[in-house]
């Protein structure tokens, strides 16, 4: 089974990646490099061809664990880009594949951030 984990360096994504790596072919999707990460196969969204790399990988399962909630005082546009537009781009890119998309959501108290 080929699995794409979106948000592979995050709390949930890193744990799911560790769990699935020994049983399946896993590629992570991340916004920026993390020198402490132990994940072997990563697609960075800063690369010009990141969408094409996802399509070439042909995942059977995509697990979205992306969560930008403003802990670094990101503006609302960054939250919308990460939490809404990024998953939509991935969904549109894999529409021709027979893949399952699993979306994981989180919530925070309203006084925490714009999230």
Language-model features, listed with the residues they occupy:
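N-terminal Rossmann NAD(P)H-binding glycine-rich loop of SDR-like oxidoreductase domains
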Residues: 2-23
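SDR active-site strand-loop-helix element
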Residues: 6, 29, 65-66, 101-107
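A generic structural motif
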Residues: 22-27, 31
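Rossmann-fold cofactor-recognition segment
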Residues: 31-49
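Conserved Rossmann-fold NAD(P)-dependent oxidoreductase catalytic core, especially the SDR/UDP-sugar
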Residues: 88-115
């Amino acid at each position: 089974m080929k699995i794409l984990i979106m948000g592979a360096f995050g709390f949930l994504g890193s744990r799911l990646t560790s769990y699935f790596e020994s049983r399946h072919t896993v590629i992570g999707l991340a916004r920026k490099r993390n020198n402490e990460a132990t994940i072997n196969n990563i697609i960075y969204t800063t690369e010009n061809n990141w969408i094409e790399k996802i399509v070439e990988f042909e995942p059977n399962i995509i697990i979205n664990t992306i969560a930008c909630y403003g802990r670094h005082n990101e503006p609302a546009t960054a939250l919308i880009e990460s939490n809404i537009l990024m998953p939509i781009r991935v969904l549109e890119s894999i529409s021709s594949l027979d893949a399952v998309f699993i979306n994981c959501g989180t919530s925070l108290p309203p006084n925490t951030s714009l999230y």
